[in-house]
Each structure stands twice: as C-alpha cells, then as structure tokens.
Curated annotation (Swiss-Prot):
A GO molecular-function descriptor: structural constituent of ribosome
Organism: Jannaschia sp. (strain CCS1)
Family membership noted in the UniProt record: Belongs to the bacterial ribosomal protein bL32 family.
Protein name: Large ribosomal subunit protein bL32
InterPro entries per the UniProt record, alphabetical: Ribosomal_bL32 (IPR002677), Ribosomal_bL32_bact (IPR044957), Ribosomal_zn-bd (IPR011332)
Keywords (A to Z) from UniProt: Ribonucleoprotein, Ribosomal protein
Disulfide cysteine pairs (residue numbers): none
GO biological process per UniProt: translation
C-alpha cells in the first residue's frame, strides 16, 4: 500500500489547493430580451443565441388557460 514518504507542509498543501476554488457564475444580459443568461448558451426566456432564434418559444395566452 502506498504511504507518504514525508509530511506535506501547509505551504505545499495550500499551493496545491490554489486552483480548487469555485468560480461564481457570470451571467450576461441577453441582447434580445434583456434577461440574464449564461455566456455562450441559449437564452432560456426567449430562445435566442447569437441574435438568432434557436428554440421556438410557444406564445401562451393567459386568458385561455384560466377558462
């Protein structure tokens, strides 16, 4: 079984963990509808990506759904 040869110092441990931090999300504003969206992803509210409609969004009439 593998056993460490010597103790890992606090400095070496910290240097190894320097790249482990989580990065907060960086949302961008959709140029079509103005909602926040993830960069390089289709806008979930309007379905546009790169100023083109990629996913057709169905128009919902609230008056018909209530009846």
């Amino acid at each position: 079984m593998a056993v460490p040869k010597s103790k890992i110092t606090r400095s070496k441990r910290g240097m190894r963990r320097a790249h482990d931090a989580l990065v907060a999300a960086n949302p961008n504003e959709c140029p079509n509808c103005g909602e926040l969206k993830r960069p390089h992803h289709v806008c979930p509210s309007c379905g546009y990506y790169n100023e083109r409609e990629v996913i057709a969004q169905d128009e919902v009439d609230l008056d018909e759904d209530a009846a």
